[in-house]
């Protein structure tokens, strides 16, 4: 999906939550968030890399990291958003929308078009509400090494 120019529907942080750009000091909280994320799980190194070289946005409640979005790759003109995850007990409050909105705003301010792909309909619904539109189908194949 891509976010056409001028189509972002911004989503503020829900009441009681803080949405902000993450720093290296947030690594522990991000590791805790993604530890039990199933197929969304990420190693500490996979979280440290975007903190250092790209961008990560998070939502927190009383200092606890409860949702996040990051860029998996960036070029001069594009930013591939991924790692969008909300802890199960905090779902349904608009947190994924809020962190995706924030990271998209930052990418746009840098002259980069936000892009992403999704694997479940709930995620697709969130992205469409923000203004993203389908531009094709992404296929991913994993091969086992012997």
Where are the regions a protein language model picked out?
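Short alpha-helical
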Residues: 25, 76, 121-122
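Conserved GNAT acetyl-CoA-binding A-motif
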Residues: 107-119
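A conserved beta-strand-loop-helix scaffold within acyl/acetyltransferase catalytic domains
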Residues: 42-85
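Helix-loop element at the rim of GNAT/NAT acetyltransferase active sites that forms part
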Residues: 22, 32-42
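A short beta-loop-alpha structural element at the N-terminal edge
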Residues: 18-30
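Acyl-donor-binding surface of acyltransferase catalytic domains
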Residues: 1-15, 139-143
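Conserved active-site alpha-helix within GNAT-family acetyltransferase domains
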Residues: 97, 120-137, 144
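Conserved acetyl-CoA-binding loop-helix of GNAT-fold acetyltransferases
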Residues: 82-88, 92-109, 124-129
């Amino acid at each position: 999906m891509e976010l056409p120019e001028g189509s972002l529907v911004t989503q503020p942080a829900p009441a009681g939550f803080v949405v902000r750009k993450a720093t290296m000091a947030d690594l522990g909280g991000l590791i805790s968030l993604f530890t039990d994320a199933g197929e969304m799980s990420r190693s500490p190194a996979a979280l440290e890399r975007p903190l250092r070289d790209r961008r990560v946005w998070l939502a927190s409640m009383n200092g606890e990291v409860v949702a996040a979005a990051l860029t998996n790759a960036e070029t001069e003109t594009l930013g591939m958003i991924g790692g969008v995850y909300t802890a199960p007990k905090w779902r349904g409050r608009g947190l994924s929308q809020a962190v995706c909105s924030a990271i998209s705003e930052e990418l746009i301010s840098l002259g980069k078009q936000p892009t992403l792909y999704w694997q479940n309909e709930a995620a697709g619904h969130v992205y469409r509400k923000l203004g993203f539109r389908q531009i094709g189908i992404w296929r991913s194949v994993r091969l086992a090494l012997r």
